[in-house]
Design a protein with these regions (language model features):
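Extracellular/periplasmic head regions of type IV pilus-like filament subunits
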Residues: 57-161, 169-170, 196-199
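N-terminal leader/signal peptides at the extreme start of proteins
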Residues: 1-13
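Aliphatic-rich helix starts adjacent to a transmembrane/signal segment
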Residues: 35-52
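Alpha-helical hydrophobic helix detector
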Residues: 19-35
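Secretory/exported precursors with cleavable N-terminal leaders
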Residues: 12-20
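A short, surface-exposed interaction/processing loop segment used at functional sites
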Residues: 165-195
Length: 199
């Protein structure tokens, strides 16, 4: 049992002390949140570059091994799905996931399979980015003996990323800072004449 005289000397936190603690927490959050958002954007951009690297490597394997088995060494402008021959998901049309050059996460991350897209809208973005065939490389799959081009653009400019990326047969990932307003869909602005992305 607590002695009533002891209770007099017990104290809790004063209102001033609680306000000081709340102010310190507010200051720490004001410092931490922008840094966390920047880290998320940087992470999304790294993942977009890796996705383009994967597409680039898949295109070269498709080209070198004539994986569509048509006798021509050519590229493809299709990510496709299992069961769709001549695509990076199913080059020979075997419907076997083991034959796929890329995994299924690319299927729903493409804005418009086989043709250039003007807006980064897709069913399931890869780390906030949609993918599209580049109009710098042409649109006729049968004439793609000399070039391919893929682009990545953010689904929400300056929220999911600040840069658009592209990859072509020159084996260099290129980028440009988006011109879109914050929150707007990306528009696949990077092209074959952009500078190489160093990070």
């Amino acid at each position: 049992m607590i002695n009533p005289q002891q209770r007099k000397f017990e104290k809790g936190f004063t209102l001033i002390e609680l306000l000081i603690v709340a102010a310190i927490i507010g200051i720490l959050l004001a410092i931490a949140i922008p840094n966390l958002l920047k880290a998320r954007i940087s992470s999304n951009e790294v993942n977009a570059r890796k996705a383009l690297q994967t597409l680039k490597d898949a295109e070269y394997e498709y080209f070198e091994q004539d994986l569509d088995d048509n006798g021509d060494r050519n590229f493809t402008n299709l990510i496709g799905a299992l069961g769709t021959a001549g695509t990076l998901r199913d080059p020979a049309g075997t419907s076997d996931p083991a034959d796929a050059l890329i995994d299924s996460t690319f299927q729903d991350a493409v804005s418009s399979d086989g043709s250039p897209s003007s807006s980064a809208v897709c069913a399931d973005p890869k780390a906030g980015y949609c993918l599209s065939w580049s109009d710098d490389a042409g649109t006729d799959a049968q004439s793609l003996k000399g070039d391919f081009g893929w682009e990545a653009s953010m689904t929400s400019a300056r929220v999911n990323g600040r840069k658009d990326f592209s990859a072509f047969t020159d084996k260099v990932i290129k980028c440009t800072v988006t011109s879109q307003a914050s929150g707007a869909n990306g528009t696949f602005e990077s092209g074959s004449n952009d500078r190489a992305c160093d990070g």
